[in-house]
């Protein structure tokens, strides 16, 4: 469970308004990533694929994350299944545990909703990165609940290298 300062950082981050930083960059990125995502998850309808990519770009950039790192994390967490539920109850694309809804103060949020799930996941990861003094490996392990072990971060990095980086 998060401590009080983490809880407050998360609430502050989620309350901010966010949008694309650079429209041209976003359009180029969306086209490239859409082709890659269609190869990786061909059953996702095109409109849902674009929504997933737009939300990933929007919240990753807004929270200071690499959008492709977020895509690699989503691949490892749910294999792009927005309705995925893990054996421990984590939900959606970024496998968010339901307790986060109460921590954030929005108990009625739908974690299967693409935007909600990606917004939560990006906010949580960005705070872990901040807490870990920008050590992304440790932050990824914290995100997964496997702090101190390298298996999960290495899976994310492998997906990032193989499919999401040029």
Tell where the protein language model's regions lie, with residue ranges.
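Catalytic glycan-binding domains that act on GlcNAc-containing polysaccharides
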Residues: 7-9, 14-166
């Amino acid at each position: 469970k998060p401590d009080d300062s983490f809880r407050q950082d998360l609430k502050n981050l989620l309350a901010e308004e966010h949008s694309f930083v650079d429209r041209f960059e976003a359009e180029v990125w969306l086209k490239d990533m859409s082709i890659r995502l269609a190869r990786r998850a061909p059953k996702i309808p095109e409109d849902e694929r674009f929504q997933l990519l737009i939300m990933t770009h929007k919240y990753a950039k807004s929270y200071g994350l690499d959008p492709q790192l977020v895509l690699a994390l989503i691949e490892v967490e749910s294999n792009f299944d927005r309705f995925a539920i893990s054996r421990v109850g984590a939900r959606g694309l970024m496998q968010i545990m339901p307790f986060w809804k109460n921590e954030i103060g929005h108990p009625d949020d739908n974690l299967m909703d693409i935007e909600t799930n990606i917004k939560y996941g990006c906010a949580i990861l960005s705070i872990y990165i901040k807490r870990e003094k920008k050590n992304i490996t440790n932050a990824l392990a914290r995100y997964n609940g496997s702090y101190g072990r390298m298996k999960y971060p290495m899976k994310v990095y492998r997906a990032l290298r193989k499919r999401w980086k040029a």
